[in-house]
């Protein structure tokens, strides 16, 4: 369900109405801010920027799990309990599922204090890493949606860069305990299970993700060929 909820002047909310006045959010700006923080705190930096700039009531990042059928909401730095499986949110027939499948952001009325919910895909070259979810005081205008899209794109790069330095993202993807064979097999898979370009698209997955029997796949891209 999409809806137009008025801003302060009866129209859609602009970024200047939502929070801190100033320049529009850009991919480069969000990346630069995240790089000043420790790898486990980069998500918190992006969330704080969005809260301050857009006046968002809440901002969260949801990462896709190994099964591809669920997402996991990652909290503030240090809140991931590695001793227990992460709490999974099943995707089927949800707004999250729609956003991941269509790779288009969605705006939904919540019915609470005229707030709206915005969910944007966090994707890099077809690799669906997760989702950016915000609750805003009013419906966003086109500029705000562009800024949210830029921030979601920045999050994809942030996760890709920082998952080499911390296990927070890996633990978030483990909604089921992995067998030893599955742990080893996942380490041998491509870092990104999908790649989309103008000339081709390739994607793969292991099923079941938590227990494998030796199957694997890989791909590499040369200037003129894709090798599988």
Which sequence ranges carry the predicted segments?
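Signal-transmission linkers at sensory-effector interfaces
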Residues: 1-36, 161
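Signal-transducing coiled-coil linker helices
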Residues: 19-22, 32-48, 173-180, 190, ...
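Structured interaction and signal-relay segments at domain junctions
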Residues: 31, 35-36, 43-104, 110-111
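… and, occasionally, acidic/histidine-rich disordered N-termini of signaling adaptors
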Residues: 171-228
